[in-house]
Amino acid sequence: FSDVDELVSSLNKELGEGSIMNFGDDKPIISIPRESTGSLVVDKALGGGWAVGRIHELVGMESCGKTMMCTLSMIEFQKKHPDKLVAIIDVENAFDIEYARKMGLDINRFLISQPSYGELAIDITAKLVESGRVGFIVVDSVANLVPKKEIEGDMEDSNMGLQARLMSKAMRVLTGIVNKSDCVLVFINQYREKI
């Protein structure tokens, strides 16, 4: 496998150290820390829970418990990290804070934002990740991340692809900053039967 090592060495020399890596028998594999979902079954399915420094998408049918799962995850995170905050970007304006408090969410270490359009939701999410104070963020939900142009436009305006472009840009912006952080970011989404 010396040819593999030579290729990696050559590319790293040309493009910068760490540009490409291989994990042969003699190389340590980097372990990604995990945060519990609050469910042993789901933790096992995810290889130990939500991967830290990664973006996740939790998808399911309407009212199947996606927000409840994320609330349980935030509660578990608060138990493990008393010095960190958790947050929800409640685009749906439907988060029941009183119910979450009864479930065990410490509202003194909880932030909520109810942005009026998608770009603002993404900007707030990015700022929370970059702050280093928030370790678990939920965006509820992708389906309601409506671009500002769509909100301000007429019903007849052609807005095809605006949300797809918004999410594409969001992933480009968020992937790098989340990857360099100690934050878990979960986007909630739902299946649609008809378009």
Specify the residue positions occupied by each region the protein language model found.
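The Walker A/P-loop phosphate-binding site
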Residues: S2-S113, I122-E130
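Short, ordered loop/turn segments at secondary-structure junctions
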Residues: D26, V91-N93, P115-Y117, S141-N144, ...
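A conditional alpha-helix N-cap/helix-loop micro-motif detector
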Residues: E35-S39, T67, G118, M160, ...
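Short coil/turn segments at beta-strand junctions that form active-site/ligand-binding loops
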Residues: K84, R133, C183
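Switch/connector loops and helix/strand junctions flanking conserved nucleotide-binding motifs
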Residues: F95-Y99, L120-I122, L145-K149, K194-I195
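Short amphipathic alpha-helices and their capping/turn segments at secondary-structure boundaries
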Residues: I124-I137, L174
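Conserved P-loop NTPase nucleotide-binding/switch module
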Residues: F136-C183, F187-I195
